[in-house]
Amino acid sequence: MIDPVATVIIVNFNSGDRLAKCLACLEAQTRRDFETIVIDNQSSDGSQAAAQASALPAVLIEAGANLGFAAANNRAAARARGAWLIFLNPDAYAAPDWVEKLLEGAARYPFADAFGSTQIDALDPAKLDGAGDVFHVFGVAYRGGYGRPVEQAPPDGECFAPCAAAAMYRRDRFEALGGFDESFFCYGEDVDLGFRLRLDGGRAVQLAGAKVFHEGSGITGRHSGFTVYHGNRNRIWATYKNMPAEIYWPLAPFRFAVDLYLLVRHSLLGNAAAYLKALRDGYCGLAALRARRRAIQKGRRIGLRELARALTWSPLKVMRRESDLRPVAGDRRAQENPSRATPVPK
């Protein structure tokens, strides 16, 4: 049997009708030399049945428990046969040429180890959901360009990390880095992996032409206590694990100021309890991460200056949620035009 070029992995948990729509979009792809694995985290709504009913051949793995996004993806990746791993959320609906554009990007930028997609808001297609993950030196990560007009989607560029709602990684690199950190459970594990990839000398490219329509926390809730807790606990862990001491310690007062600002913000949104629990568990959990931090920093293959150039320093970019892509070094080809209209999957 000839192995597929890529493996698309979808983690499902009570996604309702979204999984069926997600699979229908994959079935309509212009390039079909990929396999699909759906791993279900013990859904109670029967949504996993869509994997068996779909016209798209899909392998269904019943996890038997809610493993979380990170561990479920790792388990499915261990079953993958493709040289590329493509992670896709069940609330992300791929444009018909999405896989084709991802693999074209891999051919165009053979030095890159990971690729991100242009994420368009599925509920408001005039707006972006994200164009590459940004990591600020104050320990804040966000989807670049979130909420901005879709016409402002950037051309191809080097991103700090791709958003794993719709991203592609070299399987050998993913495995060598140990995959997603399963202690994160959900949220921020893609930024953590991207940070580790960056420290290991890897590079990630955001592809303008690879488009998906993403609901964005459509299953867990954008401002739910679950999202607030895991997102903030995990940003503390990702920063501590990966940020070199020369940057981490001098900027500690600024991270504390960010913590206070976010406390006020989440209090106004009615999520103070979830946020305070995230701070408590985040900082109390740092002791257990010391060995991992030492191993990551000991194995760092890039210089401090190179890392500093990849990080975002401007507070205004965070406040405006601007994308922060770098020109792709050595790219001699014409880049994709991100403003070209793509119909929303029905």
Q: Would you name each region that the model predicts?
A:
Residues 24-33:
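Short, acidic, metal-binding catalytic loop of nucleotide-sugar glycosyltransferases
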Residues 34-42, 61-63:
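Short beta-strand/loop segment that forms part of the nucleotide-sugar
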Residues 62-80, 90:
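Glycine-rich, basic loop-to-helix element that forms the pyrophosphate-binding segment
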Residues 85:
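Short aromatic/hydrophobic "clamp" motif used to bind/position activated sugar donors
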Residues 92-140:
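Conserved donor NDP-sugar-binding/catalytic core segment of glycosyltransferases
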Residues 102, 160-211:
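A short, conserved alpha-helix in the catalytic core of glycosyltransferases
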Residues 128, 137-141, 148-172, 186, ...:
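A recurrent flexible, glycine/aromatic-enriched loop bordering the glycosyltransferase active site
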Residues 200, 204-309:
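Active-site-adjacent helix/loop segment of glycosyltransferases
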